[in-house]
Amino acid sequence: YPWFKCRARDLFVSLPGLTLAVDEQDEFEDVMVTAEKAIREFISGEPSSYKIYEMEDPDVLLWAVWALQQYAKETSREQCRQKYGRLLEDIMDYIRSRKHDNLFLHENGLLYANGTEKAITWMNSTVNGRPVTPRTGYIVEVNSLWYNALRFIADLVREDGNVHLADELDAQAEVTGKS
């Protein structure tokens, strides 16, 4: 919907279908050039110089990982690792280091988010500036994306020889999966 501008969640959810599904790998990569810069600014705490909005929503980085996973399926895991491996590791480090302002990794392995004051998921309707459906806690789709990201990135880094990080991520996924 054009009236929403370029919202980060919508970008990453739709990117594989709009590009990879119609054999437009170059278009995917072109969009990711800008998206990667915006992600890096966000995780570095820098003000955004790109018109990709709502990057701070708790599920956005996980949707970015999912989009890159689709890229790996359509091209190759090796190509994904070469182009985006560092970005994927940096996203994972950002989340695991508890640097996100509204994404809290708890001891049970699940990610917790607070949506009391601001709509933070795809159910983002508001009335008088307040969420119609406030979503706070262990949001199911966020944690599904989290588990997926842990497993996908663990596999990629293991294939690249980083067995230590892969084992850490797999151990985290085991804890998350049991919760």
Protein language model regions, located:
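Active-site flanking loop/helix segments enriched in acidic
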Residues: 1-2, 130
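Aromatic-rich carbohydrate-recognition surfaces in CAZymes
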Residues: 5, 9-11, 15-120, 139-143, ...
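Amphipathic alpha-helical interaction segments
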Residues: 71, 130, 154-155
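Active-site oxyanion-binding pockets that recognize sulfate/phosphate
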Residues: 78, 136, 163
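Catalytic cores of carbohydrate-active enzymes
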Residues: 96, 100-107, 147-179
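A short, charged helix-loop
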Residues: 117-134
